[in-house]
Amino acid sequence: MAPGRRFRSGTWPRVKDFRTVMARTAEVRRDTKETQIRVAVDLDGTGVSNVSTGIGFFDHMLESFARHGGFDMTIETRGDLHIDMHHTVEDTGIVIGQAFNKALDGFKGVRRFGHAYIPMDETLTRCALDLSNRAYLIWKVEYKTPKVGDMDTELFKEFHHAFAMNCGACVHLETLYGTNSHHIAESGFKALARALRQAVEIDPKTGGLAPSTKGVL
């Protein structure tokens, strides 16, 4: 049996197998002619990350995502940056989504839903999500500049779409107001992370089953 985690005192009587919960980790690799990517994730970590994509601002966003989600993550991406950043950003989103989906193992035992409001100076962003295995993205985010640093702001939607589609998550992300493109981007990543942190949390009331009347997700 793989290493497990113990529930805090007081929660175990309501869990089908109260003694241990399997470690929720995954590693996914993806190699194409455009990108070579490895992602490892521990959903029950402490927010420690090792990120290298070749895009400084993107690294910063992914580090914030890991920290505020409480996920331990290793993200190694080598992409065709001599062309542009599109393949690197989108494909990284694909593999992170696949890693989360794999670690969630059929979404068994999780709270499933999560939401967060993140203020960042003049900006306020909201994320609500459902780990439904019905992938969808509602994107209501407008940037005031075409770039943040060297990164095209249009690529942030590509990342979030790729993540949602491959994680199996229904994600609604909206910036309610804001003017600084850096703040808009960062509050979006943090909102997604905080909402996911809620949604992936083990819910003892599920008894380790998928949180759905269908019995599966």
Regions found by a protein language model. Give the residues of each.
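Structural preference for solvent-exposed beta-strand-turn elements
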Residues: 21-217
